[in-house]
From Swiss-Prot:
HAMAP family: Ribosomal_bL20. The keyword Ribonucleoprotein applies. Belongs to the bacterial ribosomal protein bL20 family. One of its GO terms (biological process) is translation. CDD domains: Ribosomal_L20 (cd07026). InterPro entries: Ribosomal_bL20, RIBOSOMAL_L20_CS, Ribosomal_protein_bL20_C. Keywords: Ribonucleoprotein, Ribosomal protein, RNA-binding, rRNA-binding. It comes from the Bacteria. This is Large ribosomal subunit protein bL20. The keyword Metal-binding does not apply.
Length: 119
């Protein structure tokens, strides 16, 4: 049986991990064993936070819509309910953008929601 020398593959594996750990502080950047743990943990954080980002943006959009709706005398829930009754089919991302960047259009939507609630 011939001897297997793993110097090249081991070095390549180490370099791959150390490259991912570039920019980390101290031994997390230099030591393979510690860097490997840091890279694995960073992957876990990234996986978790890709899902949390969707929740956080939706919460931000709702806060912005609520603030815009209250400037027009409506709560968030009544504003959304009024839009649904009026048949306005805009998602929260678009509504939040209108509340921040186009206050006139958002005001028109608020008026439409108020009319639908009154009817």
């Amino acid at each position: 049986m011939s001897r297997v020398k793993r110097g090249v593959t081991a070095r390549a594996k180490h370099n791959k991990v150390l490259k991912k750990a570039k920019g980390y502080y101290g031994a997390r950047r230099k030591s393979f064993r510690i860097a490997r743990q840091a890279v694995i943990k960073s992957g876990q954080y990234a996986y978790r936070d890709r899902r949390q980002r969707k929740r956080q943006f939706r919460a931000l959009w709702i806060q912005r819509i609520n603030a815009g709706a209250r400037q027009h005398g409506l709560s968030y829930s009544r504003f959304i309910n009024g839009l649904q009754q009026a048949g306005v089919d805009l998602d929260r991302k678009v509504l939040a953008d209108l509340a921040v960047n186009d206050k006139a259009a958002f005001g028109a939507l608020a008026e439409k929601a108020r009319e639908a609630l009154a009817a």
